A protein has these predicted regions:
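Short amphipathic alpha-helix with an adjacent loop that forms part of the alpha/beta core around
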Residues: 211-221
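Glycine-rich beta-strand-centered segment in the early N-terminal region that forms part
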Residues: 36-54, 65-107
Length: 342
């Protein structure tokens, strides 16, 4: 394998190992393959990947229900960490040799990955590259849907469904670090305990308790100001039941289905807002603005220890299928990562 060298003398091979989706299907369709190392375009960096985070959208892409946006790599993986080894034209904020963690448009399950320079962030102080790889996708998602679209304001209370998921553990810690009351739902006593250890004021076991009634009780009848919901389906009318007047429901996934029956009179009378978003199709400029907001508002909180990494298990790149099996089982608490080694 011939290696090319950039101007700063970091050798980059022509070929790399990647995980391909051989056909739409279950975890078994993920296969190790060889591909050409991508070249950074203007405004992009090439990262030698140390680790890649594993997320639900990766599983959806593998199953054939969440196609990459036009121009994005068909290799799964939306967040990585590693070392910058090549720069596209116009990149000035990073230099070759810098360590970064980054949101990617795809291609993270690989030894090398390109991404816009503005989507990179420095690994937090004291965090390993594997730990840093699990930050971008969930932190971008929470920032957009809780703090921007959900408009979580000082004094507001947040309810997070799926509190023990990667999104959940990020939302708990981000909101608590900024001084908010946080309630969550989770499906076992172990998961509820883990959420409370991370800062949730109360974790509600949705298998044994009515979360809507419990949230109303915990807030003296007021309800939550913002709800982050990745379940959808029949959770939505229950969400509205425990939203405060002028409350905001932010939908980010539909693990419980895409259809719900609502009492729209309740929406009007109590001035409720229902919003939602997906991250991957958003523009480079939008994601860069989110990265800048995270670096300004959240990174200082991480650096002083108010937010900590929560990794349940790591796998090698060759065992990506096992990582997908685990995340789809719902047994994990926190994040799952692939250690690539770059």
């Amino acid at each position: 394998m011939r290696a090319r060298e950039d101007s700063d003398m970091i050798a980059v091979p022509d070929e790399m190992n990647v995980v391909e989706i051989s056909r739409p299907g279950g975890p078994e369709v993920l296969k190790l393959a060889s591909r050409a190392v991508p070249q950074p375009k203007a405004g992009e960096v090439l990262i030698r990947v140390a680790a890649a985070g594993v997320n639900r959208p990766d599983c959806m892409q593998r199953a054939g229900t969440y196609a990459p946006p036009p121009g994005a790599s068909d290799v799964p993986g939306l967040e990585v960490s590693g070392t910058v080894v090549a720069l596209g034209t116009g990149v000035t904020q990073w230099k070759i040799g810098d360590q970064v963690c980054a949101l990617t448009p795809g291609g993270g399950y690989a030894q090398f990955c390109v991404t816009p320079a503005g989507h990179c962030l420095p690994p937090p102080k004291g965090w390993s590259l594997t730990q840093a790889a699990t930050l971008p996708e969930t932190f971008f998602t929470v920032w957009i849907n809780v703090f921007e679209r959900g408009r979580l304001a000082p004094g507001d209370t947040l309810l997070v469904h799926g509190g023990s998921s990667g999104i959940g553990v990020s939302a708990i810690q981000m909101a608590r670090a900024l001084g908010h009351r946080v309630f969550v739902t989770a499906g076992s006593a172990e998961k509820c305990a883990a959420c409370e250890q991370l800062g949730a004021e109360r974790a509600i076991n949705y298998r044994t308790q009515d979360f809507a009634e419990e949230v109303k009780r915990l807030t003296d009848g007021k309800g939550a100001d913002v709800i982050l919901d990745m379940v959808g389906g029949d959770y939505v009318p229950r969400d509205l039941k425990c939203l405060a007047t002028d409350g905001r429901l932010s939908l980010i996934a539909f693990l419980g289905g895409t259809r719900a029956t609502l009492d729209l009179m309740d929406v009007l009378v109590r001035r409720l807002s229902i919003t939602g978003s997906t991250l991957r199709p958003r523009t480079v400029e939008f994601k860069t603005a989110v990265a800048n907001a995270l670096r300004e508002k959240i990174w200082p909180l991480i650096d002083v220890g108010k937010i900590r990494p929560v990794i349940y298990k790591t796998f090698t790149l060759a065992r990506a299928s096992a990582a997908h099996e685990l995340i789809e089982s719902g047994q994990h608490i926190g994040k799952i990562a692939l250690e690539v080694g770059g």
